[in-house]
C-alpha cells in the first residue's frame, strides 16, 4: 500500500518500534483497526500529493462540495517538520484516535482499497470529520466476527508500510487541529515555538526546510499539552508574518532560531524578543556554557550584558578565592618565622570556631566508630617535615585527636557539705558473664555507637553510662599497657609542656576500682 522512502532509515524505524513497545499505544487495537488507520493515512497522503505536485491530476477529483478543503490545503504550506525521534509519541497518539473516526467515515463516505493509491471524490475525508486528540481513547469494534490482537511482529510489518513523509504528517496535524483553534484560545502563548526536524532525516528535512523558508506565509505558535500520557504540541493560531522554529541538540538544550519570511520589517523586534527570552529561560545560570559546550547553536548570547556580568563575577570569585589562599599561606609562613603573638591569638580563636563546628558536625553522625574511622585518617601528621617548624601545642587540640560527643551542658554547682564531698560514688560490680560479654564487644570494636551501647545495656541489665565508662577505662588501660609513646607526646615532653610518664590520681583510682570489681565478681 505504501512505499518505504529512503529517508525513513532503519534507525528511525527501530526507535519507533521501541517507543511503541514501551508505551503500548497500539497494542490495544486489533488488526482491523490498524488497517483502517492505514487507510486513513492513505487519504491524507493523497492530499499531500495534490498539494506538492505541480500537475493537476488530482484537481479533477475535487468538486464544488470540497472547495473549502481545497482552499485550506492550498493555504497551509508545510511549515512544521516533525522530528522522527522526539515527536513520534505525538502523532502516534493523535492518529490512533483518528482511527475511530476513520472507521465510521470509511463505512459511509469512503470506498478505497489497501492496494490502490488513488481515490475518488467520495474517498476524500472532509476536514469536519477529523477530530482533536482527547485524553480518553475508546477503540471502536467493527462488525468482523473474528478479531485477533496485534503483536509486536505484526506491528513492525505495518509500520514498515507507512510512508513516513514529514510533509504528510505536518499536513495531517494542521488539518486536524486548525479548525479547533477556538477551544484553546486561553492557552495561546506568543513565546511558544514550533518544532524543527532533527539532523538524521537529511534529504527530506533539507527539501522541506527550503520550501519552508521560501513559501512560508504564516507563523505557527505551539504550546505543550499532556494528552494520553504524551506531551502534545497543539497548533493554536497562525499569522502572515514569520515562522519561528525550535532547534533541539543532544544536550537537551533548546535554542530559538528565526526563519526569514516575507515580512522583513519585524526582524529586529523578533530577534530582540528572542534574546530576552533566552536569558529568562536559562535563568542566567547556563548562559555562559552555551557557546562552549554546545556548538550546534546558531545564535550565541555570550555578548549579552547579563552574561558578561556573570562571567566577570565568576572571574572575580576565582581571583578572590586564590588571593585568600595565598594570604593564608603567607600568614602561616610569617607566623612560623617570627612567632607573632597576634597570630597565635588568631589561631586560638580559629581553633575554637573549628571545635564548635566539628562538635555540631559530629552530632549529625550516628556512629561513633564511623566518626573515629573518618577522623583517624584526617589527623594532623606531626611526622610531616613541612610541619616540624610549628609548635607542638598547635596539634594538641581536642578535635585533632578524637572528636568529642558534642558540647557539654554545665550544670550549676550545688552547695554540698564536706561529708558529701568525701563520699565516693558507688562502685559498679560487674559479673563474670557481663565482663566476658563486654570484652568480646571490645575486641570487635573499641568504640561504641549509640545502637551498640543501647543493645549491650539492655542485654547485660546495665545503664548506658556504665557501659560507656567501662569502654573508656578499657581503652585507657589498653593504651597504657601497650607502652607506645605517641609522637605528639614526645614533642610536648621535649618542649616541657607536659610529662606523660607521670601518673595522676585518677588513673590510680581507676586501677583500684577495676581490681576490686574483678575480686567481687570472682567471689560471687
From Swiss-Prot:
Stretches for region Disordered: 194-218
Gene Ontology terms, MF aspect: DNA-binding transcription factor activity, RNA polymerase II-specific; RNA polymerase II cis-regulatory region sequence-specific DNA binding
GO cellular component: nucleus
Localization: Nucleus
InterPro entries: Engrailed_Homeobox_TFs, HD, HD_engrailed, HD_metazoa, Homeobox-engrailed_C-terminal, Homeobox-engrailed_CS, Homeobox_CS, Homeodomain-like_sf
Record feature DNA-binding region, as residue ranges: 423-482
Domain of life: Eukaryota
Annotated PROSITE patterns: ENGRAILED, HOMEOBOX_1, HOMEOBOX_2
GO biological process, one term: neuron differentiation
Cross-referenced Pfam families: Engrail_1_C_sig, Homeodomain
Main location: nucleus
UniProtKB keywords: Developmental protein, DNA-binding, Homeobox, Nucleus
Gene3D superfamilies in the record: Homeodomain-like (1.10.10.60)
Keyword Transmembrane helix: no
Family indicated by similarity: Belongs to the engrailed homeobox family.
Protein's name according to its UniProt entry: Homeobox protein engrailed-like SMOX-2
Record organism: Schistosoma mansoni
Amino acid at each position: 500500500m505504501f512505499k518505504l522512502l529512503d529517508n525513513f532509515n532503519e534507525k528511525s524505524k527501530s526507535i519507533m518500534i521501541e517507543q511503541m513497545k514501551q508505551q503500548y499505544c497500539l497494542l490495544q487495537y486489533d488488526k482491523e483497526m490498524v488497517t483502517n488507520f492505514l487507510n486513513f493515512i492513505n487519504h491524507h497522503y493523497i492530499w499531500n500529493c495534490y498539494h506538492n505536485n505541480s500537475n493537476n491530476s488530482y484537481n479533477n477529483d475535487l468538486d464544488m462540495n470540497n472547495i473549502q478543503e481545497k482552499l485550506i490545503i492550498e493555504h497551509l504550506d508545510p511549515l512544521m517538520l516533525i522530528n522522527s525521534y522526539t515527536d513520534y509519541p505525538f502523532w502516534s497518539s493523535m492518529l490512533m484516535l483518528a482511527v475511530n473516526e476513520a472507521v465510521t467515515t470509511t463505512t459511509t463516505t469512503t470506498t478505497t482499497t489497501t492496494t490502490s493509491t488513488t481515490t475518488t471524490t467520495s474517498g476524500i475525508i472532509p476536514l469536519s470529520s477529523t477530530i482533536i486528540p482527547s485524553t480518553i481513547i475508546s477503540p471502536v469494534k467493527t462488525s468482523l466476527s473474528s478479531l485477533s490482537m496485534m503483536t509486536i511482529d505484526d506491528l513492525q510489518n505495518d509500520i514498515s508500510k507507512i510512508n513516513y513523509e514529514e510533509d504528510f504528517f505536518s499536513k495531517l496535524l494542521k488539518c486536524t487541529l486548525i479548525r479547533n483553534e477556538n477551544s484553546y484560545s486561553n492557552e495561546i502563548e506568543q513565546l511558544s515555538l514550533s518544532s524543527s526536524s532533527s539532523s538524521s532525516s537529511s534529504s527530506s528535512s533539507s527539501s522541506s526546510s527550503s520550501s519552508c523558508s521560501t513559501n512560508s506565509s504564516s507563523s505557527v505558535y505551539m504550546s505543550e499539552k499532556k494528552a494520553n500520557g504524551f506531551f502534545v504540541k497543539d497548533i493554536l493560531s497562525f499569522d502572515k508574518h514569520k515562522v519561528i522554529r525550535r532547534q533541539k541538540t543532544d544536550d537537551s538544550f533548546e535554542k530559538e532560531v528565526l526563519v526569514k519570511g516575507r515580512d522583513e520589517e519585524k526582524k529586529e523586534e523578533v530577534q530582540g524578543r528572542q534574546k530576552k527570552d533566552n536569558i529568562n529561560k536559562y535563568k542566567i545560570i547556563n548562559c555562559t556554557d552555551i557557546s562552549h559546550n554546545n556548538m550546534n547553536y546558531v545564535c550565541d548570547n555570550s555578548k549579552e550584558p547579563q552574561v558578561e556580568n556573570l562571567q566577570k563575577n565568576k572571574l572575580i570569585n576565582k581571583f578572590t578565592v586564590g588571593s585568600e589562599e595565598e594570604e593564608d599561606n603567607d600568614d602561616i609562613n610569617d607566623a612560623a618565622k617570627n612567632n607573632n603573638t597576634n597570630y597565635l591569638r588568631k589561631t586560638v580563636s580559629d581553633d575554637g570556631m573549628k571545635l564548635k563546628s566539628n562538635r555540631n558536625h559530629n552530632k549529625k553522625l550516628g556512629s561513633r566508630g564511623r566518626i573515629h574511622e573518618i577522623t583517624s585518617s584526617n589527623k594532623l601528621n606531626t611526622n610531616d617535615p613541612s610541619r616540624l617548624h610549628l609548635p607542638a601545642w598547635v596539634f594538641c587540640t581536642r578535635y585533632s585527636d578524637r572528636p568529642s560527643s558534642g558540647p557539654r551542658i554545665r550544670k550549676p554547682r550545688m552547695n554540698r557539705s564536706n561529708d558529701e564531698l568525701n563520699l565516693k560514688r558507688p562502685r559498679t560490680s560487674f559479673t563474670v558473664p557481663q565482663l566476658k560479654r563486654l570484652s568480646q564487644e571490645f575486641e570487635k570494636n573499641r568504640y561504641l555507637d549509640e545502637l551498640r551501647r543501647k543493645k549491650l545495656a539492655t542485654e547485660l541489665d546495665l545503664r548506658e553510662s556504665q557501659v560507656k565508662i567501662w569502654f573508656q577505662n578499657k581503652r585507657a588501660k589498653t593504651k597504657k599497657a601497650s607502652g607506645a609513646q605517641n609522637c605528639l607526646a614526645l614533642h610536648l615532653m621535649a618542649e616541657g609542656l607536659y610529662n606523660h610518664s607521670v601518673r595522676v590520681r585518677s588513673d590510680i583510682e581507676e586501677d583500684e576500682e577495676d581490681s576490686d570489681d574483678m575480686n567481687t565478681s570472682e567471689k560471687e
